[in-house]
Amino acid sequence: MAAKGNNSSRRSSRALAFQVLYGLNFSPAKDLAQLQEAYCASPDVSDRGGEAHPVGFAWELIEGTWTNQKALDEIITRFAQNWRVERIGKIELTILRLAVYEMLYRADVPPKVAINEGIELSKQFGDDKSRNFINGILDAAAKALEAGTITCKY
């Protein structure tokens, strides 16, 4: 039963991470301090009185995705056939970055879980068409990871 609670908590942390990272598409953070400000200003965090120093799973996802964005975009571009990241919708791109980050940089998140959670985020924030697009890219990345043509960073 505890595992289910943890999964629910992680899912809500992913949603928070998505919202903060999505917002950065419109008001980019230039450094880690601005990234922390964006996190602490998000409604889910500020409604709880904010956090002096960001901690927890959501923050780890935000910081890791933001820090590794260039490498994540290279992976996404590789598997998004005939799509440049500039052409991918902001919602879809944010979800892809988060899920690919989890696949490659988080030893505690199996690729199948990263794919499933990416699809869940697309159900919550995207539209029906984006799910297939996201699933296709994430599945291709997972297969490349399994085949060893891309490697984990942890």
Curated annotation (Swiss-Prot):
Keywords: RNA-binding, Transcription, Transcription antitermination, Transcription regulation. It holds the Pfam family NusB. The keyword Disulfide bond does not apply. One of its GO terms (cellular component) is cytosol. GO terms for biological process: DNA-templated transcription termination; transcription antitermination. Gene3D superfamilies: NusB-like (1.10.940.10). GO terms for molecular function: RNA binding. Involved in transcription antitermination. Required for transcription of ribosomal RNA (rRNA) genes. Binds specifically to the boxA antiterminator sequence of the ribosomal RNA (rrn) operons. Belongs to the NusB family. This is Transcription antitermination protein NusB. It comes from Oleidesulfovibrio alaskensis (strain ATCC BAA-1058 / DSM 17464 / G20) (Desulfovibrio alaskensis). The gene is nusB.
